[in-house]
């Protein structure tokens, strides 16, 4: 089986592992193929693939119909909005993603932004560089309300980091689970209430 790699984030260790399992691995991840690449640019890159380890490039119905050898797209990430799911089903092409791999990193980035704004890091940094130790009122994160739109992998990871900072965490999702409220120290609310009550809002949805 020929595996064509288009994602830029692919290490030699992963390549060697796939080859040890009998896969032919072809690296085509330094061609500048990215989100929104037209079909006539992407097709020559993946036309001979049985499986694709994909980056952010777009897979439209017209392209997927032409990829007669393709059996699987493995998305290096958790988002799949650039891949037409109806066309995948029609062509019998499978789809996987790297769920459980990036959620923690995204949650850390979210908390970094919250703390940046809560502590006005930009102003404090400027003060220190100017040697002017101004007394500023910094609201901080404690006792602030964080609203999560979506409570899947990323939402739960953000909650796990925000609660220890003393933040009140509320969330809205289509299928709330009461067990999550107790497990993560959060509260399910309506979208209207979330927008009304939150000091910070995080969209953690596809």
Predicted features by range, described:
Residues 36-40, 54, 97, 101-108, ...:
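Residues at secondary-structure transition points
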Residues 9-11, 58-60, 102, 154, ...:
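Alpha-helix capping/helix-boundary segments
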Residues 91-93, 98-145, 157-160, 164, ...:
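Phosphate-binding beta-alpha-beta segment of Rossmann-like dinucleotide-binding domains, i.e.
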Residues 30-37, 54-55, 126-134, 182-188:
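Short gly/ser/thr-rich secondary-structure transition/capping motifs
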Residues 18, 52, 73, 88, ...:
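Generic structural signal for small/hydrophobic residues in well-ordered secondary structure
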Residues 1-96:
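An N-terminal-biased, well-structured beta-alpha scaffold segment characteristic
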Residues 136-206:
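Rossmann-like dinucleotide/phosphate-binding beta-alpha-beta segment
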């Amino acid at each position: 089986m020929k595996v064509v790699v288009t994602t830029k984030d692919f290490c030699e260790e992963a390549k060697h592992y796939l080859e040890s399992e009998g896969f032919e691995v072809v690296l085509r991840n330094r061609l500048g193929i990215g989100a929104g690449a037209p079909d006539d640019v992407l097709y020559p890159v993946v036309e001979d693939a049985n499986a694709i380890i994909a980056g952010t490039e777009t897979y439209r119905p017209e392209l997927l119909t032409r990829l007669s050898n393709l059996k699987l797209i493995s998305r290096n990430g958790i988002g799949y909005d650039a891949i037409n799911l109806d066309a995948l089903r029609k062509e019998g092409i499978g789809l996987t993603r790297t769920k459980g791999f990036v959620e923690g990193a995204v949650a850390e980035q979210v908390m970094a932004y919250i703390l940046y704004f809560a502590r006005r890091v930009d102003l404090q940094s400027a003060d220190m560089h100017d040697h002017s130790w101004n007394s500023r009122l910094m609201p901080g994160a404690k006792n602030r309300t964080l609203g999560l739109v979506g409570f899947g992998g990323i939402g739960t990871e953000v909650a796990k980091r925000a609660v220890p900072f003393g933040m009140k965490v509320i969330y809205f999702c289509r299928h709330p689970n009461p067990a999550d409220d107790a497990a993560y120290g959060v509260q399910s609310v309506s979208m209207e209430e979330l927008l009304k009550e939150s000091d910070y809002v995080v969209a953690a949805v596809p």
